From Swiss-Prot:
The organism of origin for this protein: Brucella canis (strain ATCC 23365 / NCTC 10854 / RM-666)
Protein name: Tryptophan synthase alpha chain
SUPFAM superfamilies: Ribulose-phoshate binding barrel
Record key words, sorted: Amino-acid biosynthesis, Aromatic amino acid biosynthesis, Lyase, Tryptophan biosynthesis
Similarity comment text for this entry: Belongs to the TrpA family.
C-alpha cells in the first residue's frame, strides 16, 4: 500500500528537504472559512495537512486549539462536515496528503466502518487519534490499514525502549514525535534533545519522523527542521486565524490571509534550513 503520504515523503527525501506539516481545526471559525484556509495551505507551502476533528473534551490540546474546537462546534461543525471538507479539497488537489487528527469518540459515534469508508472516499490519507493506544489497535488502527489509510502514532520523551516497539508496531505514514510533555502550544523543546530523540527513534523504524508541539515561529521551525523529516505547526496557525476574529469568534479580518502569511514564512524557513545544511 502506497499512500499520498508515502509518495510525498519520498519526493521530499529526493529533494533533500523536510516536510512542513500544518494543522488547523476543521470548521474554525465556520465551515466556509475553514475550507478556504485548507485550500490555500498547499500554495503557501504546506506539504501535509492535518485536519482537526473538533471534539468537546480535547484532553491533549492547549487553550488555543480547545477554543478553535469550541468555535467550530458552536458553528455547527460535525465529523461529516469535516469529511466534506476533505472531499471538497480533493476536487482541486489530488496530491497533498490529508491527515485527520483528533479523538476516538466522534469516530466511534459515527461508526468505525462507516467512517473509514467515508474517509477513504473523501480522499483522507491518514489518521492521528491521540487517545487510542497501541493496545487498542483492533478498534481502529488495523481496520484503517485494511482500508488503505495510514495510522500515525505519537511518541514522546517518556516513550522508553520497552514501549517504543509497541508504539511503532502497525504505525504507518510517519511517526509524530511530541517534543515535550504537556499540551499543544506549550514552550519549544530543546532542539539538541529533539535531535537526539529523533536519532534514537530512527534506530527502530524506517518511517519519516515529524516533530511537533511548541513550534510557533519560522526560526523555531528551522531549528527543528535540521533534526527531523518534518516539522508540525498547529497552535501558531490556529492563533493566526483567531487573531482575525471578533470576541464572538466571527470573522472580522482575513483569517485566510493571516494563516497563509504564516505558513509561507514557515515554509521558506524550513526549506532554506535543509538546503543550507546540505551545502
Amino acid at each position: 500500500m502506497t499512500t499520498r503520504i508515502d509518495t510525498k515523503f519520498a519526493e521530499l527525501k529526493a529533494e533533500g528537504r523536510p516536510a512542513l506539516v500544518t494543522y488547523f481545526m476543521g470548521g474554525d471559525p465556520d465551515l466556509e472559512t475553514a475550507l478556504k484556509v485548507m485550500k490555500a495551505l498547499p500554495k503557501a507551502g504546506a506539504d501535509v495537512i492535518e485536519l482537526g476533528m473538533p471534539f468537546s473534551d480535547p484532553m491533549a490540546d492547549g487553550p488555543a486549539i480547545q477554543a478553535a474546537g469550541l468555535r467550530a462546534l458552536n458553528a455547527g461543525q460535525t465529523l461529516a462536515k469535516t469529511l466534506y471538507m476533505a472531499a471538497e479539497f480533493r476536487k482541486e488537489d489530488d496530491t497533498t496528503p490529508i491527515v485527520m487528527m483528533g479523538y476516538y469518540n466522534p469516530i466511534y459515534v459515527y461508526g468505525v466502518e462507516r467512517f473509514l469508508t467515508d474517509a477513504k472516499a473523501s480522499g483522507v490519507d491518514g489518521l492521528i487519534v491521540v487517545d487510542l493506544p497501541s493496545e487498542m489497535d483492533a478498534e481502529l488502527c488495523i481496520p484503517a490499514m485494511k482500508a488503505g489509510i495510514n495510522f500515525i502514532r505519537l511518541t514522546t520523551p517518556t516513550t522508553d525502549d520497552k514501549r517504543l516497539p509497541k508504539v511503532l508496531h502497525n504505525s504507518s505514514g510517519f511517526v509524530y514525535y511530541v517534543s515535550m510533555n504537556g499540551i499543544t502550544g506549550a514552550a519549544i523543546a530543546d532542539t539538541a534533545k529533539v535531535g537526539e530523540a529523533v536519532r534514537h527513534i530512527k534506530k527502530s523504524t524506517d518511517l519519516p519522523i515529524c516533530v511537533g508541539f511548541g513550534v510557533k515561529t519560522p526560526e523555531q521551525a528551522a531549528a527543528i527542521a535540521t533534526h527531523a523529516d518534518g516539522v508540525v505547526v498547529g497552535t501558531a496557525i490556529v492563533n493566526a486565524i483567531a487573531g482575525e476574529l471578533d470576541e464572538k469568534g466571527k470573522v472580522k479580518g482575513d483569517p485566510v490571509a493571516a494563516a497563509t502569511r504564516l505558513v509561507h514564512a514557515l515554509a521558506e524557513s524550513v526549506r532554506a534550513t535543509r538546503l543550507e545544511a546540505a551545502q
